[in-house]
């Protein structure tokens, strides 16, 4: 689900670009993630209100980004049982398995954090002699210069924080303040960062759609039905049959991770069976990982607050605290950018689209504080 579809996505890229703020995906954090969250949360709440009336005991399996913002808002505003599902944990495990030359079926791992910024706390395999830690093999990939060209950002973060992050390099590069700089094209080249990547994907998908549709409709070229590593169908199967499975899900932090805020959306292993979806307690994360996550959690928290209360000032504050936005723009630029985006999205942000009145109120408030 993408609220306002391609026009909304293009707006989230093109207006920030006028301020010199470049993005890669813009669907999870950053100014693009904030705007996408503000457009999406009200629609998901409408879905949940329908569920409250029609199927109050059902589970909502959410695949929609910005995952953490969406699930956090739903956990606060509706009793519908929600789990957010992503493929970054199991997908990255498969990628690392290829990098180190170990079959993924032989690997066991424990991963925890927030969506798109969870880390493998353990990455290992059982051997005849016990358990082998596979992190030395990952470090060897770096030492031997075998880092894939498309994955340089994540491997760089790994060398500095000591654990490997789940989400892709193009995503990660816009969650932190270090890799995308408007006056540092050398960084873009060094880390092979695909700016405007989401727009490129949209254009490719649109261009290819007619061909894909013809292939799908032709029995000779129709896709074979095979299970992927996505969790949705297996969760439904376990809930209905009782067959136990462990999946990685995004749920409210109810004493699951000690050094992240209670109530925040966290990504942890969850046992699924006929008893429901049961998250696993992790305890405390390594302090450097929790500190890095908090730079993202702060933005998520204020965006959710804005979506649920309609208070425009929380949008400004979320943008000011966003690591990438704050590294590129000053406060006045950030305020102006937020105003421009809200105006451009118009009726898609009805709680905030009072336009000139809101801007005038903000200016008066700002002037009053300055004069005081």
Which residues fall in each region the model found?
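Soluble or luminal CAZymes and related metallo-dependent hydrolases
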Residues: 39-43, 88, 227, 295
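Glycine-centered flexibility sites
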Residues: 8, 30-33, 84, 242, ...
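Long, compositionally biased stretches enriched for glycine and/or charged residues
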Residues: 101-371
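Rossmann-fold NAD(P)-binding glycine/threonine-rich loop
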Residues: 8-76
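Sparse, context-dependent recognition of short Cys/His-centered cofactor- or disulfide-binding micro-motifs
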Residues: 6, 29, 59, 67, ...
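Internal, well-ordered domain-core segments that constitute the primary functional module
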Residues: 47-118, 124
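Short, small-residue-biased leader/transition segments that mark boundaries at the very start
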Residues: 1-3
